[in-house]
Regions:
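Short glycine/proline- and aromatic-enriched beta-strand/turn motifs that initiate or cap beta-hairpins
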Residues: 19-90, 195, 199, 309-313
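Residues that define the transmembrane beta-barrel architecture of outer-membrane proteins
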Residues: 43-49, 97-103, 139-145, 174-178, ...
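Extracellular loop and loop/strand-boundary signature of outer-membrane beta-barrel proteins
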Residues: 34-41, 89-95, 132-137, 166-168, ...
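Repeated loop/turn-to-beta-strand initiation elements of outer-membrane beta-barrel proteins
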Residues: 20, 60-63, 115-119, 157-163, ...
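Outer-membrane beta-barrel "beta-signal"
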Residues: 51, 55, 179-187, 249, ...
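Transmembrane beta-strand segments that form the barrel wall of outer-membrane beta-barrel proteins
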Residues: 123-129, 158-169, 180-206, 220-222
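Membrane-embedded beta-strand positions of outer-membrane beta-barrel proteins
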Residues: 22-24, 74-78, 120-123, 161-163, ...
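Outer-membrane beta-barrel translocator/channel fold
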Residues: 32, 85-87, 198-279, 289-304
């Protein structure tokens, strides 16, 4: 599901150029807090490799007098994330996966509606495996069909608000979930920018245009990964949510190449197994004496990433 929303975010701002991105992330070693035992039970680090491509197949340019410059587009998105976790000293029965692979393919269609509205439809499939091997993909076990229908209101040229429905069969049967979208691109003076996005996780960036080919950004990103697997003969989902804050210099080469580098901290990197049931999605892992929930996660750690994006703008 995450992949399809990532493509929606990109597709709403894409033009006639294809876009390809590659990214490598490193999260340093830190202790793992287990919510059930209320203690640290192990430690670990992680490397995350991501690649994505968004290819517009056909495009009708926006009307010249359209203040929101809304094109009509058909496109295809491909996405892959490969997580390698180096876990140590976890007791038997509490081990986390050492690998997670998420792959997705999505067909998308975007078109303007009336004066301030756009419609976006998406249909795709993704695989969520506990191994970084194509042979670990099994239909009926870790392959999920998904789709989305989102209406976007262009409140202002730099503010978009959307809502709709998302569909997937995570639990073995079709389920409909609400989908929300928000995007803001603003600026004050000639040098400072603000970007806020919310559809595949929260993303906030405060930017400063130091030179024509160099931006500095303070970024905060929330994301995550999943693996559908069997433990003790039962279907379960391993999920990992991440929250990263860092300083990101972004180097630009010409109009179509950007190289972002990020240095900062990983403040949330959870790790939890759930039954593959709808009720389990809302169940607390453990609770404190006052009734508040607590979750298993790695302690804060050093974060470093490097990437390159080609095409797009």
């Amino acid at each position: 599901m995450k992949e399809i929303f990532t493509f929606i975010t990109l597709f709403l701002g894409v033009n006639s150029f294809a876009q390809i991105s590659v990214k490598t992330e490193y999260i340093s070693n830190s202790k793992f807090y287990d919510a059930v035992s209320d203690s640290n039970i192990g430690d670990g680090s992680a490397m995350i490799y991501s690649v994505g491509a968004l290819v517009p197949l056909s495009m009708k340019a926006p009307e010249e007098d359209d203040p929101y410059q809304r094109p009509t587009l058909w496109g295809v998105g491909l996405n892959g994330s490969f997580v390698q976790m180096y876990n140590h000293h976890f007791p038997v029965g509490k081990e986390l996966p050492s690998q997670v692979m998420n792959l997705g393919v999505t067909a998308l269609h975007l078109r303007p509606l009336k004066e301030r509205w756009s419609m976006l439809m998406a249909l795709g499939a993704g695989s969520y495996t506990p191994e970084n091997r194509l042979s670990s993909i099994h239909i009926g076990e870790n392959v999920v069909a998904n789709g989305a229908f989102v209406l976007v209101w262009h409140w202002r040229p730099n503010i978009e608000i959307g809502g709709g429905v998302a569909l997937n069969n995570t639990f073995g049967y079709p389920m409909v979930f609400p989908a929300f979208y928000f995007k803001y691109n603003g600026a004050f003076s000639d040098k400072f920018t603000i970007e806020v996005g919310s559809i595949d996780g929260l993303k906030v960036a405060l930017g400063y245009n130091y030179r024509e080919n160099l931006d500095f950004k303070l970024i905060a990103n929330m994301g995550g990964y999943s693996a559908y697997l069997r433990r003790n003969g039962e279907k379960e989902i391993f999920s990992q949510q991440t929250f990263v804050v860092g300083l990101q210099p972004e180097f630009k080469i010409g109009k179509h190449v950007s190289i972002p580098l990020t240095v900062g901290g990983s403040f949330i990197r959870s790790g939890r197994y759930r039954e593959r049931k709808l009720s389990a999605m809302f169940a607390s892992e453990a609770k404190n004496e006052d009734g508040s929930s607590r979750s298993s996660q790695f302690n804060p750690a050093f974060y470093l990433s490097a990437g390159i994006t080609i095409g797009g703008n």
